[in-house]
Amino acid sequence: MLYVSDIISRFNGKLLCGDENMILDNFCKDTRIIKNGDIYVGIKGESFDGNNFYADAFDKGAKACILDNTTLVDTDRYGDKTIILVDNTLECIGKLAKYKRSLLNIPVVAITGSVGKTSTKDMVASVLSTKYKVLKTEGNNNNNIGLPFTILRYKDEDVMVIEMGMNHFGEISYLTDIVRPT
């Protein structure tokens, strides 16, 4: 299990308000699909700053937010919620996924390549699911943003089937360091 205190102690996080003993599960980076009880992670994109959507996440039921920019945070309004400040949310989520993976002793199949990664991942997961409970990459969330969220979705599966893609030099090495395929 992961706790707010793990982010504080292991990844230089700062608790702005809330419960450091809260269990962290059900991470989400998109307020359009956030569910009650999720942990919202505000990630900066090319044309948006996910930190700006923290209030929307709370209004839709998020129990905590992990942010790297708190200039707009209203702790008077959301002081009863858990808000964690980190240096960089994208780096934090990668480190958190790597830490969670280090706690797991299960087989992990990693699939990469130029063409056919998603189809191959789906076929391998389908075959394994006839005998095992499988966690697999959803769709093609196979980069330095999507892959950590896959690892963080782990509950009690027997095996993981992870798709790894790249769009910049060194990304496969970075993802392999998180996934540690067996």
Regions from the language model: what does each represent?
Residues 1-95:
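N-terminal leader/targeting and accessory segments in enzymes
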